[in-house]
């Protein structure tokens, strides 16, 4: 066997090994997330389901030069620019369309990375999580402070507390994962709140505010106990 054939065979084996390693990569990915151990099988199953459904499209997009970080940035810009701009102009339908685009694109970066054999990187997981959390904060602060008291806006105090407790919950959930501190799950209220905000606009019926108030209490307590577990581990 020639040297070039040997090198080609070795490269092929390495490529197959990389493709055969999703579980290990997924574990690395999950460390940079706010999912507990009981949630991870569901999270991974949903990620694989999205990949299986959209695999032909994802591969085609990858061949056109689209990369996961491009999708993440586009998702972030939709919620950073589109949502506050339309909400401030009282174009609530367009604001929710921008939010829907943010959510849809946010669900595509992971499967696209998997289609390109780039899944499981800590950098990609960090960008994805930052997009999730920052998007939530932008949405909540926008609906709290823009057009306050009008339309489908929410109480300023409750909205602010909700955004702050969500941030602290995320910080200590991720810290526990990075320190290998086991916790079962974290109740995530982001998507239910988005849906309730949409319902408030469509039907003028406000369930978003009381749900956010209750969720803030839960997230504050979860963040506090997460802080205690992290502090004990760092002694």
Predicted regions and their residues:
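A feature for the membrane-embedded catalytic helix bundles of lipid/isoprenoid biosynthetic enzymes
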Residues: 2-58, 129-235
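A short, mixed-charge helix-start or loop-turn motif at secondary-structure junctions
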Residues: 39-43, 64, 120
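Membrane-embedded alpha-helical segments that form the functional core of polytopic membrane enzymes
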Residues: 68-123, 207-216
């Amino acid at each position: 066997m020639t040297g070039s054939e040997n090198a080609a065979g070795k490269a092929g084996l390495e490529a197959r090994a990389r493709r055969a390693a999703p579980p290990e990569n997924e574990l690395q990915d999950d460390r940079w997330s706010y999912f507990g151990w009981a949630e991870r099988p569901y999270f991974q199953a949903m990620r694989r389901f999205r990949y299986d459904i959209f695999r032909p499209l994802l591969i085609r997009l990858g061949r056109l030069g689209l990369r996961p970080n491009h999708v993440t940035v586009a998702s972030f810009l939709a919620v950073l620019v589109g949502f506050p701009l339309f909400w401030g102009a009282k174009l609530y339908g367009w604001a929710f369309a921008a939010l829907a685009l943010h959510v849809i694109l946010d669900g595509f970066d992971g499967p696209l990375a998997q289609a390109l054999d780039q899944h499981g990187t800590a950098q990609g997981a960090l960008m994805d999580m930052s997009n999730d959390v920052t998007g939530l904060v932008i949405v909540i602060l926008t609906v709290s402070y823009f057009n306050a008291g009008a339309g489908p806006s929410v109480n300023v105090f409750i909205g602010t507390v909700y955004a702050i407790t969500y941030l602290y919950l995320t910080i200590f959930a991720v810290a526990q994962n990075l320190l290998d501190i086991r916790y079962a799950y974290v109740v995530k209220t982001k998507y239910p709140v988005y849906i309730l905000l949409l319902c408030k606009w469509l039907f003028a019926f406000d369930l978003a505010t009381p749900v956010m108030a209750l969720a803030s209490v839960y997230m504050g307590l979860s963040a506090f106990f997460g802080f205690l577990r992290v502090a004990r581990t760092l002694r």
